[in-house]
Amino acid sequence: MDFNRSFTSNLGSAGSAKSQQSMFKALRRLHGQNLESRGLHDMTEAFQSFVTRARFFSIGKLRRTWSHSAAEFMKYRRLLPMLLADGDAFDGGETDDFDASIAFQHTSRDDRKIVVSNISAKVTQSQLQSFFSQYGKITSCILPREEKKTSVFGTLPKHSRNCGTATITFKKSEHADRAKNANPEELKFYDQVMVVSAYVSKKRGGKGLVLSDDVGSREDTPLSRASSTQSLASGSEQSFNLGNVPDKILRRVISFLPIHETIRLERVNKKFMEESIKSWELVNKIALARETVFNKQRPMRTSHLKAILTRAGAHLRSLDVSGIVHLLDDRRALKVIATCCPNLVDLDISGTHAQAEALEELGESLSHLEQLSYRGMETTGDKAFYFLLKNCGHSLKFVDLRNSKRLHGRSFKLFGSQLESLYLDGSSKVDEMAFEDLCTSCGGLKELRINECYKITDENLSMIARRMEDLSILTLCGDGFKSLTSAGLIHISHMRNITELALDYNALVNDELLISISAGLPLLSSLSLANAGNDSSITAEGVSAIKNLKELTQLDASSLAAVNSKVLEQLGSLKKLEIIQLRNCTYLGDDGVRAKLRMPNIRHVDLSGSILVSNDSIQQFIKAFPSGPKLPPITLVVGGTAADASKLSVRGSRVVVDFSDYSTIVTMQTSQCSSSKFAIGGSASDAEGSDDEFEALTAQRSFYIDAVCGEEESPITDDGKLAEWAEKEARSLGLIKD
């Protein structure tokens, strides 16, 4: 504020000595008021902001601040020695003409600007500038547009929409006043009434919002679809004030926000900063793969991880850094996890490659760790796994080391008796010594998944049956077990507590094993035999023995030639069966489908690729399960069968018919397993194997096309003749080899 100009009348009307003395008294009084209010009369947010800066920085640096208030403060500072001098009694009438508003006069540039809101999405910047040129010459027109989105399909519009708010600068302030005083009808453009308001700069307004001098006069103005920043800010402030939200509620709301939004809220104000920091106390689990802010264009870096874990690490119980696009410095990243997250119970660092020393440091710091996942580490050696488990392996209850191609298992001796679940699928180099160490140190193991662990032996399986009495889940899928025999698989029948067993693609499965399992595993509830054994090793006798598993709820017998209608009739005694998959069962006919009508708890039936199944049995199955209140739906998959969708009716039934053909999934898995077998050292060449697979697939497709699209012959009503015909056709097509 220019004090010389403010008191010009006082200085000119009295003598110089008396006038100076009166001025000093007035300034001293003003100085006292300023000291009480801690600012230059504390009149606006601009002065408050400036005084805040002045209190926290030395007065000598104020010359770098070029605002109007800074210049006035420098003048005021030069008069401080005189203000502190003693004087006579102060006459209050001498300062009655003091006008504080002169310090806040609008600059000429701001007077020439206006803010236009509620702009139609069709309006372009040139159109808007041409429209307002009727009020005067325009020097600039800024109409921001939304961020342009991209799509590989080319379905998005070529031009992005405008944001609905523009800033226009006129050459003269009189022209801006004309636009402000214009009638609403004059501001109608594309059937929308635009709203013109005064421009308030960020420096004078104190906030980055568009403010207006006549908010009340526009409260009743009808607005169209778009809404300006002004109307949004004023409307939300009148209806709902976030400052009145209780701290606990605000903290709870912030805890549900994405991580990057939670960190951004710290910049809003002091209250939001405090509640944002406290909200991390409510977050005990973080899965970084869910944070969409990290992608190929913006990968996660170590600084991002540190910023997150310094806030949330002390409260985290579970951390998952797998599946995220990152450029992490592996050593520093693991050090950040080890330092910031001492209370972790569950950790997934899959995809994070690191040296053995960094893994050892991580294991030392996580004394409470119970679940560890480090899967897909195809290039990580056995040494790294050893140092990772060296200090925390004894306390682990769950370990996932799937697809660790270079893992031999020397670290398994570090596991303790608390280990309950171990996943080793695809870790093909885990040898027999590792399984011996596992049986010695982990007698309480309940879940063991060793699919494609091809170095396991008969002795290992026997030791597992004897030492792991609590084992309830066992998976032994794959077709490359060279050190395992069919006789060794019989040891599985001695594991009395097994409830889930999977032997998919295991060529060692035979009738003897199925009969032993049916007699020795009374608690078995899930059995998977997809593509197991061969046509000669698994017969109808072995599959029929499954009827003795009274607790069975899930069964997968896909691609087993022994599965036919007679076998399904015997399996109809499994009253608890809920899910049954019979894909590519080429000898399964309508009678087998009718046998499922005796299963009251059935929920899912997959008949994909079972080409002898027709509309008759499918329609009977649909009618057997009428709809009713609180009755769950039943899914019936009939893709690849002889079913005709146009002749099926599901009215009044709770059966949902799915015409998808999932039998190709089985074919793909077969080809993958075959290729892996050749890579290990099969006798056939890759070219010969590929030709055999192609011929088998072609024969199967030809058989299916002939069955569905061929010319109709006289129907065969006798089941025996139908079976003979199917066998004859299969032999002629090469599906059955003598």
UniProtKB/Swiss-Prot annotation:
InterPro entries: F-box_dom, Leu-rich_rpt_Cys-con_subtyp, LRR_dom_sf, Nucleotide-bd_a/b_plait_sf, RBD_domain_sf, RRM_dom. Residues 112-201 form the RRM domain. One of its GO terms (molecular function) is RNA binding. Residues 239-297 form the F-box domain. Residues 211-237 are annotated as: Disordered. GO terms for biological process: SCF-dependent proteasomal ubiquitin-dependent protein catabolic process. This is Putative RNA-binding protein EEED8.10. The lineage of its organism: Eukaryota, Metazoa, Ecdysozoa, Nematoda, Chromadorea.
